[in-house]
Amino acid sequence: MSEFVTVARPYAKAAFDFAVEHNSVERWQDMLAFAAEVTKNDQMAELLSGALAPETLSEAFIAICGEQLDENGQNLIKVMAENNRLKVLPDVLEQFIHLRAASEAIAEVEVISANQLSDEQLARIVSAMEKRLSRKVKLNCKIDKSVMAGIIIRAGDMVIDGSVRGRLDRLADVLQS
């Protein structure tokens, strides 16, 4: 987790509350995603760490974003620039996404496997996890050859390790004790 999460959280909460109030959550997430990508640009990163006046910086940032930001998105950029916080935009986006997922009762579940899983396998995992967590599930699939075979499922603090690597590690622990 980034060191800027504490700084980013109030901006994300304000943006999320505004977006919910104005029924524009998807639009706000898109604006924040675009603005976060702009901060990752090498030239923009240089400007963000430079000594530009906040007003000049916000004008430059808004000009680069162009039509991607509506008036309210531009206002957020201005406030963040005044407080020298534009560099935390990626963390604002991350926090916004977490707030959205929590409000929509969606659990993010990470599935790690040695090989690409079929659509049928993914559907079975989604079904089982939705039943177990009592909420909708969004899968984030990763491939890690060190798993060897089987899968590892992570949802918050819960970890289900059905991998060959996990079994071998547990067997090694038993043999050593």
From Swiss-Prot:
Gene3D superfamilies per record: N-terminal domain of the delta subunit of the F1F0-ATP synthase (1.10.520.20)
Domain of life of the source: Bacteria
Keyword set, alphabetical order: ATP synthesis, Cell inner membrane, Cell membrane, CF(1), Hydrogen ion transport, Ion transport, Membrane, Transport
Subcellular location as annotated: Cell inner membrane
Keyword match Heme: no
GO MF entry, a single one: proton-transporting ATP synthase activity, rotational mechanism
Matches recorded under PROSITE patterns: ATPASE_DELTA (PS00389)
Pfam families noted in UniProt: OSCP (PF00213)
Keyword Ion transport: yes
Disulfide bonds: none
A GO cellular component entry from the record: proton-transporting ATP synthase complex
Membrane topology: Peripheral membrane protein
Purpose of the protein: F(1)F(0) ATP synthase produces ATP from ADP in the presence of a proton or sodium gradient. F-type ATPases consist of two structural domains, F(1) containing the extramembraneous catalytic core and F(0) containing the membrane proton channel, linked together by a central stalk and a peripheral stalk. During catalysis, ATP synthesis in the catalytic domain of F(1) is coupled via a rotary mechanism of the central stalk subunits to proton translocation. This protein is part of the stalk that links CF(0) to CF(1). It either transmits conformational changes from CF(0) to CF(1) or is implicated in proton conduction.
Family classification: Belongs to the ATPase delta chain family.
Subunit note: F-type ATPases have 2 components, F(1) - the catalytic core - and F(0) - the membrane proton channel. F(1) has five subunits: alpha(3), beta(3), gamma(1), delta(1), epsilon(1). F(0) has three main subunits: a(1), b(2) and c(10-14). The alpha and beta chains form an alternating ring which encloses part of the gamma chain. F(1) is attached to F(0) by a central stalk formed by the gamma and epsilon chains, while a peripheral stalk is formed by the delta and b chains.
Protein name: ATP synthase subunit delta
Organism: Klebsiella pneumoniae (strain 342)
Gene this protein is translated from: atpH
